[in-house]
Amino acid sequence: MARTKQTARKSHGGKAPRTLLATKAARKSAPTTGGVKKPHRYRPGTVALREIRKYQKSTELLIRKLPFQRLVREIAQDYKTDLRFQSHAVLALQEAAEAYLVGLFEDTNLCAIHAKRVTIMPKDVQLARRIRGERA
């Protein structure tokens, strides 16, 4: 089909029929009176990707300090009672634990991707630990 040059045309104004304007106005006003505006929702996966980028940029500890400290004390009681911890010792344990978990989740994600999945499963964690030689 040949392309034609568009030229400006002068509009020949005139009044639109009253019935058409009335129906347009009725259509515009109808949904606003009875309808409640739905809250905005992002598409599935958008927020997850945003969180991934946020946590990959950050360096702060992700596990809360007090619950981790209680866990350390609870585990330490099995070996020796009345143990005391310096605050720096608990922080060092937390840094090491989080570094280990991040690495484990990276390997777990690779196992899931290898299985042509995007969701990690317990079997991926088990495989990652088995390959690392942590659990025979």
UniProtKB/Swiss-Prot annotation:
The modification Phosphoserine is found at S11, S29. The modification N6,N6,N6-trimethyllysine is found at K5, K10, K28, K37. InterPro entries: Histone-fold, Histone_H2A/H2B/H3, Histone_H3/CENP-A. One of its GO terms (molecular function) is DNA binding. It holds the Pfam family Histone. Residues 1-42 are annotated as: Disordered. The modification N6-acetyllysine is found at K10, K15, K24. It is found in: Nucleus; Chromosome. Residues 1-15 have a biased composition (Basic residues). PANTHER family: HISTONE H3 (PTHR11426). Belongs to the histone H3 family. This is Histone H3-like 3. It comes from Arabidopsis thaliana.
